[in-house]
């Protein structure tokens, strides 16, 4: 299995990074915190023109999400990309709106909020901790019963939920006889893909914490020397870099396993989630420490990655659930 990036993936990375550097500097990420969904419309349309919602293979989508995570991009990117995958080949207005960046889609993946009921095409029930719920125009529900596309119309109520991560707001979505469209997609495959792409987004954030720490360690001086010359700081940065590479390797392996339909795909996805969550939580905390007292201030961006790491740990296939899955798979082996 070749895990090295292809020239096409390198080209995607360069293109996406240039776009995000121009359109989503950290100042704009901060400005979008608490903004309504309409504030995202120009960004979504520009991203669609660049092909963000095109039908790429999972390994190429992973590159996209690494860059989104590196930029700490706010908004329901994961839900929209997974919805585009579920709608691939569709020709109706709903599909065209997603592909064209006119519709933002939030993903209802984690079964938090109790069971959902579907009767005569009408959905009822609640999903909590839905990332980007308040910014979405529609919802993609991935459930044991199948894959449902639900426009945000009558019968759909969204309530904002207090969240540690202001760059990635969450909400509670209540469906009351909401109209749905059942999609002929494999729910298990979409679930695996969603967790892999969430891991890829985390990998980008993990890598960015390494960059931030190394950059700061080169310029911040104590006792007449850059702090990066001191063993305590340089070893911490080295440990961060190792965790970043482990997380990236596990996520690439999981992406390839899912793409190729490997028998152990579920196992690899769970491993990637656990390793990425552990790495992100630790790297984000170490990044704050490497910045010293400044790292604890609102003005320093380090705390934003701490908050994103906490949100990643608890959503889109939470780490604790993946650990339970790994234990069950080991016992069944």
What are these regions (language model features)?
Residues 1-71, 192-333:
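Alpha-helical interface subdomain recognition
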Residues 5, 77, 118, 123, ...:
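Short clusters of hydrophobic/aromatic residues that line enzyme substrate/ligand-binding pockets
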Residues 21-160:
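Glycine-rich flavin
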Residues 90-93, 120-122, 181-183, 259-264:
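Short, glycine- and charge-enriched coil/turn segments that flank and shape catalytic ligand pockets
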Residues 127-132, 152-185:
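Flexible, small-/acidic-enriched active-site or ligand-binding loops
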Residues 141, 174, 200-203:
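Well-ordered beta-strand segments characteristic of repetitive beta-sheet solenoids
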Residues 188-189:
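Residues forming anionic-ligand binding surfaces in small-molecule and nucleic-acid pockets
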């Amino acid at each position: 299995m070749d895990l090295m990036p292809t020239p096409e993936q390198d080209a995607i990375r360069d293109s996406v990074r240039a776009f995000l550097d121009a359109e989503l500097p950290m100042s704009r990420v901060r400005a979008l915190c608490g903004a309504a969904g309409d504030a995202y419309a120009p960004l979504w349309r520009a991203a669609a023109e660049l092909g963000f919602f095109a039908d790429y293979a999972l390994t190429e989508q992973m590159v996209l999400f690494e860059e989104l995570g590196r930029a700490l991009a706010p908004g329901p990117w994961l839900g929209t990309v997974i919805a585009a995958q579920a709608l691939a080949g569709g020709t109706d207005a709903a599909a065209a709106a997603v592909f064209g960046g006119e519709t933002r889609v939030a993903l209802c993946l984690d079964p938090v909020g109790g069971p959902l009921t579907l009767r005569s095409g009408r959905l009822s029930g609640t999903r909590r901790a839905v990332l980007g719920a308040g910014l979405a125009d529609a919802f993609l529900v991935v459930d044991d019963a199948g894959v449902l596309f639900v426009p945000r119309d009558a019968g759909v109520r969204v309530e904002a939920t207090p969240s540690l991560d202001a760059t990635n707001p969450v909400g509670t979505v209540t469906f009351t006889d909401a109209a749905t469209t059942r999609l002929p997609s494999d729910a298990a495959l979409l679930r695996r893909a969603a967790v892999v792409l969430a891991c890829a987004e985390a990998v980008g954030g993990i890598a960015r914490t390494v960059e931030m720490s190394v950059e700061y360690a080169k310029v911040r001086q104590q006792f007449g020397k850059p702090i990066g010359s001191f063993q305590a700081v340089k070893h911490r940065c080295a440990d961060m870099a190792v965790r970043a590479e482990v997380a990236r390797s596990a996520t690439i392996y999981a992406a390839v396993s899912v793409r190729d339909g490997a028998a152990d795909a579920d196992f690899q996805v769970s491993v990637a989630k656990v390793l990425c969550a552990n790495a992100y939580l630790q790297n984000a905390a170490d990044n704050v420490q490497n910045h010293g007292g400044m790292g604890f201030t609102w003005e320093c961006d380090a705390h934003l990655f701490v908050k994103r790491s906490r949100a990643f740990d608890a959503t889109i296939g939470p780490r604790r659930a993946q650990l339970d899955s790994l234990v069950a798979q080991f016992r069944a082996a």
